């Protein structure tokens, strides 16, 4: 994957400089060495994701594209935590998570198992719990996936959450479900291949999808 205006070394320097600015500490050299070990794997995961998104140029990563940089920080944090799990690795992953929150306004913890391919339209206000996420997920601003009394949703493949939507609690969201703007799905299931709208008296209106909207977002 081509890194626009960067090499792997300079991208690492850039990331470490941001971490040092926001979360200064005395372990800069050790942090850089740790991130350097995991950067190639994180970039490989990022490349696979970018190549599947229709609106992005395949084979290149632009660090000034805030949505792409948001994914980069998640993949790097998750890779560091997943591959090591030591106290020092947790510290590095935590700083990357907090940097992502500071720069992009997203609450995406490094322990969350995001799918291999997902797209963030606008990251501001997105809050994601430790739920089960299917591949080809689409998230827009102020969308939420959360637990209710400790129970997290299960999302199938090809789920789209438009702005200000939410999936909360004991939900099984069928594949290719689109949750419309401002709609909250709370302790409810959806059949899949459908559009979900806010109805009256807290009920949902569910309509069959005329075509797979997910095709607008991804290359299959």
Q: Which ranges hold each PLM region?
A:
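Conserved short-loop catalytic and cofactor-binding motifs
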Residues: 60, 64, 125, 147, ...
């Amino acid at each position: 994957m081509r890194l626009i205006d960067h090499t792997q070394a300079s991208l690492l320097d850039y990331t470490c400089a941001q971490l040092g600015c926001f979360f200064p500490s005395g372990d800069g050299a050790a942090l850089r060495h740790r991130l350097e070990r995991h950067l190639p794997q994180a970039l490989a995961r990022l490349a696979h994701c970018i190549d599947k998104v229709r609106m992005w140029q395949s084979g290149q990563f632009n660090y000034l594209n805030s949505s792409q940089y948001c994914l980069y920080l998640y993949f790097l944090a998750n890779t560091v935590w997943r591959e090591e799990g030591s106290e020092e690795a947790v510290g590095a992953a935590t700083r990357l998570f907090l940097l992502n929150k500071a720069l992009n306004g997203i609450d995406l913890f490094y322990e969350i198992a995001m799918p291999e391919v997902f797209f963030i339209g606008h990251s501001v206000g997105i809050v994601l719990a430790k739920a089960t996420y299917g591949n080809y997920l689409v998230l827009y601003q102020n969308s939420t996936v959360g637990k209710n009394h400790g129970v997290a949703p299960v999302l199938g493949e090809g789920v789209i959450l438009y702005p200000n939507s939410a999936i909360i609690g004991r939900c099984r969201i069928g594949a290719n479900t689109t949750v419309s703007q401002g709609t909250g799905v709370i302790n409810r299931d959806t059949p899949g291949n459908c559009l979900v709208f806010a109805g009256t008296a807290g009920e949902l209106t569910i309509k069959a999808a005329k075509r797979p909207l997910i095709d607008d977002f991804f290359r299959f």
